[in-house]
Design a protein with these regions (language model features):
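C-terminal and inter-domain tail/linker signature
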Residues: 1-163
């Protein structure tokens, strides 16, 4: 079975520890494995998810939000465009990526502002994302910052090749 984290474009990154951590984390996200993701983040973890309007979410709150995502979405994939940064303690990494998904259910009212207008159960969509992750001294994720935009009509991930 193919991985839901498509990393072809970043396989040659020099920092193999970083590549392994990023792969593990985004595979867990795409597999809707909130428990695995939770095990990779520090106790004092903080998440900011700008597309969702979340400025600061604690580890516990983000765990619950991730579990909620898995009840809403299926066929999740994450395709890496580029990876920069380091796995060194105190450093950060930036992953440019595209998240695609299909709705398992009709979206609840609270989720509708973050989805394309009129999207319903069985419809697919996605977002182009910039994910920034900071590492603590134990190699755990201390902070995460997500920026993104819904995919637009005619979106072509290959337009990002060759930067």
């Amino acid at each position: 079975m193919a991985s839901p984290f498509i990393s072809d474009r970043i396989q040659n990154h020099d920092d193999k520890v970083l590549l392994a951590r990023i792969t593990e984390y985004f595979e867990a996200f795409a597999n809707a494995d909130a428990d695995k993701m939770d095990s990779m983040v520090a106790d004092d973890y903080r998440m900011s998810d700008i597309p969702l309007g979340i400025v600061r979410s604690s580890k516990g709150a983000w765990y619950q939000q991730n579990k909620g995502f898995s009840s809403l979405m299926t066929n999740i994939s994450v395709e890496a465009i580029s990876l920069h940064g380091s796995s060194e303690p105190g450093s950060f990494a930036v992953l440019e990526n595209v998240v695609r998904f299909t709705l398992k259910v009709d979206p609840p009212e609270v989720a509708k502002p973050n989805l394309p207008p009129g999207i319903k159960k069985g419809d697919s969509s996605g977002m182009i994302m910039l994910s920034t992750i900071w590492w603590n001294s134990d190699g755990k994720i201390a902070r995460e910052l997500e920026y993104g935009k819904l995919l637009w009509e005619g979106f072509d991930i290959n337009a990002f090749n060759g930067w």
